[in-house]
Every structure is written in C-alpha cells, then in structure tokens.
C-alpha cells in the first residue's frame, strides 16, 4: 500500500523550518512499517484538521502533517503543547527524518 507523508515544523526559538516529503517506498522496510504503525496508533485519519493549544506560545513548534494513503488524504496542524501524546512520537521521528535529508 502506497503512503506519502508531507511534514513541516516551524517556530521554536530560532524560527527554523524543517520540512520533508517522505515516500514510503524510499524508506527501509522497517522504517516504513514503524511509521505506518505510528500513523495508525495516532488514529491520524480521525484527528481534527487543527488542534489548538489553550495557551499558544510564540516559541512553540507548529507542526503540519499530511498523510496520503490509498484514497485517503488528511492534514493535521498542531502546536507542540496541543499535540496529543499519540502524535508526539510521530512528530519526533519525522523531524529526525527531515533533518537526515
């Protein structure tokens, strides 16, 4: 099953932008499986499009994540503080992948 992930992180103290587009076919089988499991664990396709924080801080990271799988496409925007715990590991992993280039 094909899956594509577009990921962007902005904000933080330095205001650095980290962005990447990941085609699952370009990853190792283990990495692809792990990412897919993280997307499933977060119930990503059921999440609201915008997850707002009750206390928005200017130096928080903002995340924008789009996942395309089969006929489905869903985008979620969330701040660090607002992101549900199920999304945190996915954001961390994608940030690492984005930095790896």
State each model region's role.
Residues 1-101:
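Function-determining sites in protein domains
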């Amino acid at each position: 099953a094909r899956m594509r992930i577009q990921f962007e992180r902005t904000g933080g103290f330095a205001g650095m932008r980290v962005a990447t587009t990941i085609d699952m076919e370009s990853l190792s089988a283990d990495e692809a499986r792990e990412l897919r499991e993280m997307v499933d664990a977060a119930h990503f396709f059921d999440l609201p499009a915008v997850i707002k924080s009750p206390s928005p801080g200017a130096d928080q990271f903002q995340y924008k994540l789009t996942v395309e799988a089969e006929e489905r496409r869903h985008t979620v925007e969330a701040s660090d503080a607002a992101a549900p715990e199920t999304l945190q590991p996915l954001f961390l992993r994608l940030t690492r992948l984005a930095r790896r280039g």
